[in-house]
């Protein structure tokens, strides 16, 4: 009987990518297949996030629930990976003695060896070292389902924002060689991938050697241009970027590379220069707006999403008003916004914070309501327009319909003859938008033909 692995992922898209790689590593080494049911698993892995306290505590809550599974199935192995593992290390085993494996983002490729050592010794294995970019040299070729895929281009972050644990849990910035990234993307394209999302904590800082050991360096704009030249790749996305390193070279890429989507996730974190300085973000609101102004001069239809932190220590009502003014001016399409969560070991954790939580919550609700109004307005403005979408598969709500995404990341559901589904999935097609809903759009396919290629015209 085939053994199975269950992975629960917390946090960012980098973690989603890493979770897929955990499955790939265990499949290549031991033949394990992924399961969506922990009860069926022989190995249960939690890929964790420590950006906010709530996410960190949820890991231990979930660990408590799977403890019963281990008691009923003694051979079951339980592992904790990701940023909480990097931060807590062996203390995870002290707190939850039934955990067998603790590994960081940079050591997931060592899972098979750690499992062997655990079985041989009977003791929990902990490896949270930072062997730089080593893991990419030991990962098997990517296995993908569907026309979209993530590709990690670098690891870590060297910005050391005052509130953020990422540099401490993932290490400083290290870029993959250009050739390595291009080889992975080309392999994905051969499997039918049409859209890649280039991943990094700060992709703007990408500085990859042209080949392993080379002294010649490619910047992020160069990488995008090379990816665009790979046959089969029709869309390029990336996340996450940092305003401080959004160079003119990268801005110019929006004019040179049509395959680069007109959607940008550019975290601003706050709209007050005073708070941005306390956060050690390294830019002003004016500098941030200047980047967006230049981009929209090239791509007037650019949609913009961001991250925002409400209730940072010392935030006044005036600071919050400046944040809201920026939200209105930028017309954000989406925002991942949260109340500030102090993280142990970061400089901001020592700052005096005298703002009552109920005030922070009220501000967050106001911010999120405003963003939701923006989202609804933008969705309504798309009704009646023809949108180019990448068909990803059957609709979740109705398997008789298909679903795809627009450039600005809207889900579009549309009816299509069942016989046409296999040839439409993975194609770029035109859909006329008829209805806008809170979290999706509905449209109609403009052309259905017996010729699969005709679906892309």
Curated annotation (Swiss-Prot):
PROSITE patterns, alphabetically? MTTASE_N, MTTASE_RADICAL, RADICAL_SAM, TRAM
Spell out the molecular function terms from Gene Ontology: 4 iron, 4 sulfur cluster binding; metal ion binding; N6-isopentenyladenosine methylthiotransferase activity
Keyword Iron-sulfur: yes or no? yes
Q: Where is the Radical SAM core domain?
A: 143-377
Binding residue positions for [4Fe-4S] cluster 2: 157, 161, 164
Q: What is written in the cofactor note of this entry? A: Binds 2 [4Fe-4S] clusters. One cluster is coordinated with 3 cysteines and an exchangeable S-adenosyl-L-methionine.
Instruction: Give the InterPro entries listed for this entry.
Output: Elp3/MiaA/NifB-like_rSAM, Methylthiotransferase, Methylthiotransferase_CS, Methylthiotransferase_N, Methylthiotransferase_N_sf, MiaB_methiolase, rSAM, rSAM_horseshoe
Binding-site positions, [4Fe-4S] cluster 1? 12, 49, 83
Q: Name one Pfam family in it.
A: UPF0004
UniProt keyword Zinc present: no
* Disulfides per UniProt: none
- What cofactor does this protein call for? [4Fe-4S] cluster
Instruction: List where in the cell it is found.
Output: Cytoplasm
Its UniProt entry gives the catalysed reaction(s) as: N(6)-dimethylallyladenosine(37) in tRNA + (sulfur carrier)-SH + AH2 + 2 S-adenosyl-L-methionine = 2-methylsulfanyl-N(6)-dimethylallyladenosine(37) in tRNA + (sulfur carrier)-H + 5'-deoxyadenosine + L-methionine + A + S-adenosyl-L-homocysteine + 2 H(+)
Gene3D superfamilies with a match to the protein in the record? Methylthiotransferase, N-terminal domain, tm_1862 like domain
Q: Which residues form a coiled coil?
A: none
For this UniProt entry, what is the primary localization, expressed as one broad class?
cytoplasm
Protein family membership: Belongs to the methylthiotransferase family. MiaB subfamily.
The task this protein performs is described as: Catalyzes the methylthiolation of N6-(dimethylallyl)adenosine (i(6)A), leading to the formation of 2-methylthio-N6-(dimethylallyl)adenosine (ms(2)i(6)A) at position 37 in tRNAs that read codons beginning with uridine.
Q: How does it assemble?
A: Monomer.
Tell me what this protein is called. Answer: tRNA-2-methylthio-N(6)-dimethylallyladenosine synthase
List the gene name: miaB
């Amino acid at each position: 009987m085939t053994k199975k692995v269950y992975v629960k992922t917390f946090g960012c898209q980098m973690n989603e990518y890493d979770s897929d790689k955990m499955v790939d590593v265990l499949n290549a080494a031991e033949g394990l297949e992924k399961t969506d049911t922990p009860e069926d698993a022989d190995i249960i892995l939690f890929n964790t996030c420590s950006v906010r306290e709530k996410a960190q505590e949820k890991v231990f809550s979930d660990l408590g629930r799977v403890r019963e599974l281990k008691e009923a199935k003694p051979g079951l192995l339980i592992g904790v990976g990701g940023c909480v593992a990097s931060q807590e290390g062996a203390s995870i085993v002290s707190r939850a003695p039934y955990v067998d494996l603790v590994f960081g983002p940079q050591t997931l490729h060592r899972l098979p060896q750690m499992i062997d050592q655990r079985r041989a010794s009977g003791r929990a294995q902990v490896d949270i070292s930072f062997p730089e970019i080593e893991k990419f040299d030991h990962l098997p070729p990517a296995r993908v389902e569907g026309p979209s895929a993530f590709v990690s281009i670098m690891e870590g972050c060297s910005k050391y924002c005052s509130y953020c644990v990422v540099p401490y849990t993932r290490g400083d910035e290290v870029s993959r060689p250009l050739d390595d990234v291009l080889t992975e993307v080309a392999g994905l394209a051969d499997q039918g991938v049409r859209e890649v999302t280039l991943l990094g904590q700060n992709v703007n800082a990408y500085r990859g050697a042209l080949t392993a050991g080379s002294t010649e360096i490619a910047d992020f704009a160069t990488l995008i241009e090379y990816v665009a030249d790979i046959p089969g790749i029709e869309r390029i996305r990336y996340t996450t970027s940092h305003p401080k390193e959004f160079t003119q070279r990268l801005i110019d890429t929006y004019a040179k590379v049509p395959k680069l989507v007109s959607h940008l996730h550019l975290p601003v974190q706050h709209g007050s220069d005073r708070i941005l300085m306390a956060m050690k973000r390294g830019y002003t609101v004016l500098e941030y707006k200047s980047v967006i102004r230049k981009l929209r001069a090239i791509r007037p239809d650019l949609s913009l999403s961001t991250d925002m932190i409400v209730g940072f220590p010392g935030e006044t009502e005036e600071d919050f008003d400046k944040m809201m003014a920026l939200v209105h001016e930028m017309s954000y399409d989406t925002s991942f916004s949260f109340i500030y969560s102090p993280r142990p070991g970061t400089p901001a954790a020592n700052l005096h914070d005298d703002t009552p939580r109920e005030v922070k919550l009220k501000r967050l609700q106001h911010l999120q309501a405003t963003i939701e109004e923006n989202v609804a307005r933008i969705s309504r403005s798309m009704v009646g327009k023809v949108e180019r979408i990448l068909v990803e598969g059957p609709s979740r709500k109705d398997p008789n319909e298909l679903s795809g995404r627009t450039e600005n990341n809207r889900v579009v559901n549309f009816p299509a003859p069942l016989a046409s589904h296999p040839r439409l999935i993975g194609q770029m097609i035109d859909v006329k938008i008829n209805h806008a809903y809170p979290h999706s759009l509905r449209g109609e396919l403009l052309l259905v033909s017996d010729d699969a290629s005709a679906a892309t015209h």
